[in-house]
Amino acid sequence: MRADGATVTFIGTGRGSGAGLVAAAGIDDDVVPMRGLERRLAPKNLIAVALAAAAVPRAMAILRRRRADVVIGGGGYVAGPVALAAWLMRIPVLLTEADSHLGMANRLAAPIARRVALAFPIAGRTGDKYVVTGRPIGPEVRAATRAAGRAALGIADDAMCVLVVGGSQGARTINRAVAQAFGDGPSFELIHLAGAGQLDDVRALLADRAPGARYHLYGYLDNFHDAVAAADLVVSRAGGSVFELAAIGRPAILVPYPHATADHQTKNAQWLVDAGAAVLVPDTECTAERIATLVAELLAEPARRDAMALAARTVARPDAAQAIAAAALQLATA
C-alpha cells in the first residue's frame, strides 16, 4: 500500500511481538489499552469489557487525527473496537481472517465491515462482502529458492533434507516422535526446529543418543523461509505455516494441534491434503514409528514428492497481501 502512495499506520496494545514488527517496518503506531476475553466466566473479563468500551472513543480520536480513509482489521481483540469506531465515523472497514473460521473479533465486526478477506472459504460466508484472498506471506517467502536456502543453512545440494517444525513454542508430540525416530543418526540432513520452549526437552531426549552431524537442532530460525526452501519434505503443525509451505511448494506431513480453536489446524491441514500436497497424521497417531515410516516412504518416492510439491504451488496464493491491499485501496477511494 505504501508503494501505491498510501500512508499506513497501526493501532495496537503496544505489547507482544507485533509491536516490535511494526517498529521494524518503520510504521507509526498508536496504542489503545486492551486485553482479550477469557473463554470462561472470569472477573478479568469485566476489565476487558471496560477497556473495550473505553477503546472506542480513543480509537475515534486516533482515526480522526490520522485522517483515516479505510481501516483494516487483523482479527485481534483490538480490531473490534477500532472497527466499531470506524463504522461510527463512516470509514469503510476491511477485515482479514487468517484461519479457517472467523475468530470472535471478526464474527462480531463482520456485520459492519464492507469486505472480509478470507484465508480459506468458510461455509455461510459468501456474497460480495466475502472474498477468498489467502493469507499474506512475506516477500522473502515468495523469493525463497532451494539453492539459497541450502547455502544459508550449509546443506549440500545433493543431500536429502527433512525439515521438522513444531511451531514457535514447539510441539511436544512431534518433537518426541522425531527425536525417538532419528536420535541415533538420520540417513538424511534433518533440520529440527523444536521451538524455544521445547529445546531443552529435546536435548534431554537426545542426551543418551548419537544424533550425529546430520541432525541440526534449533529452537527457531529467523530465516524460516530458507529452511522450508532447503527441504525435500516438511513435518509440521498446521498453523499459518501451511501458506508458506504452499507458496514455496514443499510436500508435507502435517500433525494438527488438537486443541486449536474450532480445530482450525485440522481444517488447514485438510486444505493441503485435499489438494494432494500433504499427508495428515492425527496428534494421537504421531509416534516415532509412524513418522519414521512416512518419512522413509516419501523420501523413497521422488515422483510422489514432485507431484505433492506441484499440488502445493497450484493452491498457493502468494499474492494474498497484494489482493488485500488492492481491496483496501478500492474502499478508501470509493
Model-based region annotation:
Residues 7, 17, 28, 87-147, ...:
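Active-site-proximal region of nucleotide-activated glycan assembly enzymes
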